[in-house]
Amino acid sequence: MASRFMTDPHAMRDMAGRFEVHAQTVEDEARRMWASAQNISGAGWSGMAEATSLDTMTQMNQAFRNIVNMLHGVRDGLVRDANNYEQQEQASQQILSS
C-alpha cells in the first residue's frame, strides 16, 4: 500500500510560530550575554585581555545573530510554503469542480 503525504498548512504555521519563539529566546539571551560582558569588561581588565574578551564576545554575538536569522528563514519558509500549498489546493479544487 502506498503511503500518502498530507500537508497541513495550519500545522506549518503553528510550527513557524514556534521558530519565532525560539528566535526571540536566542535573541534575548544573546542580549543578556552581551550586557553581562559589557558590565565585566572594565572590571580589572585592560589592554590585550580586554580587547580579546571584547573580540570573543563580538564573534559570539554575531554567531547568535546568524542563528536568529536562520530561525527567521525557517519561519518565513514555512509560512510561504503553507500559503503556496493553500493556493495550489484551491486552484486544484476549482479545476476539479469545473
Swiss-Prot record:
Give the record's GO CC terms: extracellular region; peptidoglycan-based cell wall; plasma membrane
- Keywords assigned by UniProt? Secreted
Report, from the record, the phenotype seen after gene disruption. Answer: EsxJI deletion mutant shows extremely slow growth in broth cultures.
Domain of life where this protein originates? Bacteria
**InterPro entries found in the cross-reference section:** ESAT-6-like_sf, T7SS_ESAT-6-like
SUPFAM superfamilies in the record:
EsxAB dimer-like (SSF140453)
Q: What does the record list as coiled-coil region(s)? A: none
Record bears the keyword Secreted? yes
Q: Does the keyword Transferase apply?
A: no
- Write one Pfam family the protein is assigned to: WXG100
Induction profile: Differentially expressed under different growth conditions.
Query: What subcellular compartments does it reside in?
Result: Secreted
- Similarity-based family: Belongs to the WXG100 family. CFP-10 subfamily.
**Name under which the protein is recorded:** ESAT-6-like protein EsxJ
